[in-house]
Amino acid sequence: MYVGNAGADAALDRGWILGHFKDAGDPRHSEDVEIKWGVHPAGDERAQWVRGEARTALLVLISGRFRVELPGRSVLLERQGDYVVWGRGVDHSWVAEEESVVLTVRWPSVPGYAVAAGE
């Protein structure tokens, strides 16, 4: 069992609180799903599109204003609880239009998808 605080724990691992990247003995280790508590200052962005995505993703807006760019569509999350889901093979990028907190759930949890900071 593990009891924590998403904001405090996320700050220790680039926002991630559950997934394959946690130690095997940690209850937060999972190869099936990964969860991120993303805290983004206004203007924070993933300018480089994530390509060849092998996971399904769900993003839920907790607070702020957050835009997700998908092929042929721009999705604005602006009310608490707004969410977007996309499947495997869908490229994407994003920008925090205001300071935002976003809960991301992706499955499966696949190694090798980290994008370098600032990209």
Locations of the language-model features?
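A short, N-terminal "cap"/entry segment at the start of jelly-roll beta-barrel domains
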Residues: 1-42, 46-49, 118-119
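Short histidine-centered beta-strand/loop micro-motifs
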Residues: 27-29, 46-53, 70, 76-77, ...
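Structural motif
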Residues: 65, 91, 99-101
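Double-stranded beta-helix
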Residues: 1-3, 12-15, 95-119
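Short acidic-glycine-tyrosine-enriched beta hairpin
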Residues: 72-89
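Short, conserved beta-strand element in jelly-roll/cupin
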Residues: 40, 51-68
